[in-house]
Structure formats: C-alpha cells, structure tokens
Amino acid sequence: MKEKIPFYNEKEFHDMVKKTKKGTFSGWYIINKNNNSVEFSGSFNRQFKLNKPVIPVNTEYVTRKEFNEYKDSNDQRLTKIETELKSQGQRIQVVEDKVDRLTEVVMVQSQQIKTQGEAMNARMDRFESLVLKSLESIGNTLTDFGKRLDVIETRLDKIDPPK
C-alpha cells in the first residue's frame, strides 16, 4: 500500500507527528523532492491519511481573564519599549545638542585661527621689512667704513710713502 501525503521536508513531517501526538505509522517513508511529497508504505491511522491534525480532547481554552492578563503583559512590554525609545530619543537629542555646540566652538576657533594667521602674516611682513632695512643700513655703514679706510690709507701713504 503506497500513499502520497504532501509534506515538504522531513522536519515538517516530524513536526506534524509531534503536534498530533496520535500520529503513528509502521513502515517506511521516502521524501520525494521533485513533487514535494512523502511516500509511505505501511499501515497508518486515519489522522495521517487525511493529513489533518486532530485537536486533542484535553485542549484548554483561554479564559477571558487569561487573555486580559496576556494583553496587559503585552501592553506593559509595549509601554516599557516606548519609554526606552523615548529615553534613547532624549539621549540622542542631548548628543545632537552637544554636536551642535561643538561645531559652533570649532567654527569660532577656526575664525580665531584665521585672524591669528593674518596677524602673524602681517607681523612677518613687518619683520621682513625691518630685517631688510637693518641689512641695508649695515651695508651702508660697511661701505662708509670702506670709504673711510680708503681715505685713511691714502693719507697714510701721503705721510709715509712706500719704499
């Protein structure tokens, strides 16, 4: 006796056996991957032949009180998640404010650095001009000393002619 029952894989078949608790068979089965079915050989109970799990008689129904407790616990979890999200949002807002303040400080400092750089460039230009003037004056004094030395040498030559 062969019968094909649509289970998609071995795990699904075993899950079905666990769900029904009454599903028993004796024999073997082959999972056919081409048409996604399981091929059985052996004897089955009615439950597996129909491929419908039978709800056990001892199933408990949920009472209104249990449902309300479940609903309340879900509401509590949701409110907890909401408060966590709000607190994280507040922390994010604080961090954004700090970042904004830091960007303002960076902008102010960059402006200060620019003005200091311009002032430094002006000082360097002035220093350069002063150095050039001092070098020029030193050069002039050296030429004056050279002229004076020439004058002194000519006078010495006149006083004491070379032999």
Swiss-Prot record:
Domain of life of the source: Bacteria
Xref: InterPro entries: DUF16
Signal peptide coordinates: none
Family according to the record: Belongs to the UPF0134 family.
Protein name (database record): UPF0134 protein MPN_139
